[in-house]
Regions:
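Alpha-helix initiation and capping sites
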Residues: 68, 72-75, 101, 128-134, ...
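Charged, low-complexity surface segments at secondary-structure and domain boundaries
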Residues: 2-16, 120-123, 140-154, 173-175
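Internal, well-ordered alpha/beta segment that forms a basic, Gly-enriched binding/recognition surface
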Residues: 95-129
Length: 253
């Protein structure tokens, strides 16, 4: 799950914060800031991008609602992630959230027993509390779901597998390019990042190219892939993923 920074409330030509009367009116602004991806599963979407309230506007009785129209409470989601999340009360102490944590760190994408599908699991090496939080986030968004119904709706696991194949292909192209006497490092790294922009599922790309600093620089370049939280990657150390909340001793992720 890609860590995000969508920035402050957009402004109009006069520099005034934009105010909307319907939350869906944030859609184009969100696309301009973070791209056309579901913020949770990271699949790219050509249509049906849903504007989703991070903190539900209609939570269960007794739970404070999230702001119905505020920019700070808006993100983009696919139907399966948004429907799974529903009106569940949300806070950053219970779940890993892309604007609050380095959400690349607590999850891994792996093949299911059925190799046509890839699912999200808790990353190896988490402590007990982090593992539970990662598990709860996966459960909240059904990121380990495989839709086996004849009238399949949720194809996230199929798209993850397709992204895995894209990453493998990109790695082969990269290795051949590096071996070429005409190798241009900047051109090749930029090409890899543009492939990632088309593919989505960014954690797969970070994992594959983690030891290629120039590729990591391009993968986290907001001019190529909008909205990545650059403070979650260390430019002094080859753009390695780092904790977003280092002051939180219990869980710096």
């Amino acid at each position: 799950m890609r860590p995000l920074n969508k920035g402050n409330t957009p402004t109009d030509a006069g520099g005034n914060a934009i105010v909307v009367t319907a939350y869906r009116d944030w859609r184009n602004h969100l696309i301009n800031r973070i791209g056309y991806y579901c913020v949770y599963c990271n699949q790219p979407l050509s249509h049906s991008l849903q504007v989703e309230h991070v903190i539900p506007k209609n939570p269960p009785a007794g739970v404070a609602p999230g702001a119905a129209l505020d920019w700070d409470n808006m993100l983009l989601a696919c139907g399966p992630c948004n429907n799974a999340k529903g009106n569940t009360p949300i806070d950053a102490n219970t779940y890993y959230l892309p604007e609050e944590h380095n959400t690349h760190l607590p999850f891994s994408i792996v093949l299911n027993a059925n190799p046509d599908h890839a699912i999200v699991i808790e990353r190896v090496g988490l402590n007990v509390n982090q593992h539970q939080k990662a598990h709860d986030t996966i459960d909240l968004l059904e990121l380990d779901n495989i839709d086996a119904r004849p009238a399949i709706v949720d194809i996230r696991s199929l798209k993850r597998k397709a992204a895995m194949l894209s990453v493998q292909s990109a790695r082969q192209v990269y290795d051949m390019a590096v071996a070429s006497p005409t190798y241009n490092a900047n051109v090749v790294a930029t090409d890899i990042a543009r492939r990632a922009a088309d593919s989505g599922f960014f954690s797969l790309w970070y994992e594959e190219f983690i030891n290629e600093p120039l590729v990591m620089e391009k993968l986290t370049d907001n001019a190529i892939i909008k909205g990545t939280a650059t403070n979650c990657f260390d430019p002094a150390n080859g753009y390695q993923p780092i904790h977003r909340n280092p002051a939180n001793i219990a869980d710096p992720i």
